[in-house]
A protein has these predicted regions:
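Short, structured beta-strand/loop micro-motifs enriched in basic residues and often containing a Trp
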Residues: 156-162, 198-199
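Conserved hydrophobic positions within beta-strands
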Residues: 152, 194-197
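Glycine-enriched, solvent-exposed interface loops adjoining structured elements
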Residues: 1-156, 169, 180-189, 201-203, ...
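Residues on the solvent-exposed faces and adjacent turns
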Residues: 165
Length: 294
């Protein structure tokens, strides 16, 4: 089955019984609706499972100079999950969770962080050493049409990648690009800057995590909806419901909403829990020591 934007558009038209040759909804319109429903309906539904879908982290080396850090730009809801400090640069087993404070609490604690606007502020001062990991839920990339990506067909190790067609106009020398996997959940495996781009070739100094069949896209774009494959039918149905609403088809809208509700109910057991045989265990978190802020 084709899960690229091209395939999703075809599935939506079949489910909504929309003729292929109609002019009411263009492919661009349908992709816009896919992105709206993905971010506004499907992502919140998946997050409500509370099974750490989309969880990732940014890692920042500490040197005693940085007291404030921007919340990652691609964090869903512009919020974070937690912050941990790895006190060893070589052993990830030595870490502590940094407590979140409010401005009214800072005088009662020897150290932590608080949120001010879109920034994370360390208190009482910068941390001298270690690796700070900011865990957050990453927003799925924007679904784009086939005119904005190319498929890797040949890899010249640590030199370049060659695509099956010429690179699209949005990918040029110096462009920020993403390499997207061709297997679900279609993660972005590499975020990098394109070297010299010529026809179907992109020069890259590191190709270690790229495979034939992966997709080359502009930054924060993807041929796919970057969600579990089992939730793709929900996304398709939600777009169908939106179409019925736009067309003023009251009967179709009501039927579509009932179908979506049933599909969502059936789907919930597929995405949660993510581990069936082992319940979550709650343990005492590692605690910070005062020396971290000395």
């Amino acid at each position: 089955m084709d899960f690229t934007s091209t395939g999703l558009i075809a599935q939506i038209k079949r489910r909504a019984l929309i003729p292929t040759s109609q002019n009411l909804f263009t492919s661009s319109d349908i992709i816009d609706m896919l992105n709206e429903e993905l971010q506004n309906r499907i992502v919140p539904y998946i997050l409500n499972a509370r099974e750490d879908y989309f969880l990732t982290y940014d890692e920042i080396t500490q040197d005693g100079t940085q007291t404030e850090i921007d919340i990652p730009y691609d964090a869903i809801g512009n919020k974070i999950n937690q912050i941990t400090l790895y006190t060893s640069t070589t052993d990830d087993s030595f870490f502590a969770t940094i407590p979140r404070l409010t401005p009214s609490q800072i005088n009662d604690y020897f150290g932590g962080y608080y949120i001010e606007g879109n920034k994370i502020k360390l208190y009482p001062k910068a941390i001298a050493s270690g690796k700070l990991r900011i865990y957050y839920y990453k927003r799925p990339s924007e679904i784009v049409a086939s005119t904005r990506w190319a498929i890797v067909s040949t890899i010249n190790t640590n030199t370049s990648i060659v695509c099956s067609t010429n690179l699209p106009a949005n990918i040029t020398t110096g462009s920020e690009i993403d390499i997207v996997k061709n297997i679900q959940p279609w993660d972005t495996t590499r975020e990098t800057t394109a070297g010299t781009v010529s026809s179907a070739t992109v020069n890259l100094s590191d190709t270690s995590d790229i495979s034939v069949g992966y997709y080359v896209c502009s930054k924060d774009e993807s041929p796919f909806a970057q969600i579990p494959q089992d939730t793709i039918p929900l996304l398709i149905q939600s777009v169908v419901v939106r179409m019925m609403e736009y067309m003023g088809d009251t009967n179709g809208l009501q039927a579509g909403l009932l179908t979506y509700a049933q599909m969502e109910s059936d789907n919930r057991g597929l995405i949660s829990p993510r581990v069936d045989a082992q319940p979550k265990k709650i343990s005492v978190k590692n605690r910070l020591s005062r020396y971290l802020w000395r």
